[in-house]
């Protein structure tokens, strides 16, 4: 036996002018700022990417390929060695770099690729639940352990340029990207800023940002930036 219910509803048509709302990065995520800077410096570049939160950078125009963990660097190197002359800038997270990115970096250096590698180091393995990784100095059980230096690994791999910067210092970070762009070979930029979710859990309080309706001029910079 069963029963039926009568539902009364009125269909509603959405306004035609509503913008598309695709999945985006978290509010305050440093990946957004890093990718915004990348797009400003490498305007006509090619952007192979990897598996992580930063895959959502596709909405910012800085993710052209995503295949599997570690493929960003190897795809970038392959494009360079195949004769691509445009800027090739790949993105990979700190966890993924340690998982399967180091081999690709060594291969790119060994074979003479001309690429820029941006390692998005948010100090945690964020996408799968904020687990620690070898760069954090903690084991999965929270026990202190020696931390791996991404800078040291990259220099040992033979990268011609290794610099670290915070995307939150946008002007300085853009200058680092420009310096890398002016050089040949395998250049590595480590974009380091803690995951904003981890910061919130650590009770690091930030202010709330809103659009000031009286000052807004409709330039749509916030939309281009992917501001949530």
Residue ranges and their predicted role:
Residues 58-188, 201:
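Thiamine diphosphate
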Residues 207-215:
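Generic long, charged, amphipathic alpha-helical segments
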Residues 1-8, 191, 207:
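Terminal amphipathic helices with adjacent charged low-complexity linkers/tails
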Residues 7-73, 82-85:
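Active-site diphosphate/adenylate-binding microenvironment
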Residues 217-228:
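Iron-sulfur cluster-binding cysteine motifs and their immediate structural context
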